[in-house]
């Protein structure tokens, strides 16, 4: 009987030792902590050797403890992400609404293509040229933002103006598990 108590004591000690080692597993190592930036900032991301830019707005109400929805707002053909984010009017400035709606909004920059204007290419699922396919870029953008912020991946929305609306449609049709809903402004 004494042997059983000794084994039980060793087992309990081992279990508590394991728990203590792993109890902080969800906390970031201070050396690995990421900088949370609130408000409107300009960001970059590398995608297939190309530096892509986007404007990001994180509301002051952001709380890393709570999963947060993400809205991706695509500009139209010939547009500019910075100018689009700064535009005024009823259909613009999603970042103002994000304060009360408690969501993060990003305005990615399209790529200058054949026509000499920044545009979106929703591509084709069978396309092997992922440099010309903004579906892959958008997936990487979502993953990149989720590494820094606590994104609710079931609440990622796409909205777009004109060619940006076509991009939102492309995401809804070709990446339905990544996008919860879309909105088209023109």
Task: Kindly label every feature range from the protein language model.
Residues 82-84, 116-117, 168:
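Short glycine-/acidic-enriched loop or helix-start segments at secondary-structure transitions
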Residues 110, 183-186:
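Active-site nucleophile loop of the alpha/beta-hydrolase fold
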Residues 107-133:
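Cap/lid segment of the alpha/beta-hydrolase catalytic domain
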Residues 68, 75-79:
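Active-site glycine-rich loops that stabilize anionic/oxyanionic intermediates
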Residues 126-149:
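Alpha/beta-hydrolase active-site loop
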Residues 18-70, 90-92, 97, 101-103, ...:
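A domain-start/cap signature at the N-terminus of enzymes
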Residues 81-93:
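The serine-hydrolase catalytic nucleophile loop
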Residues 1-28:
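Bacterial Sec-dependent N-terminal signal peptides
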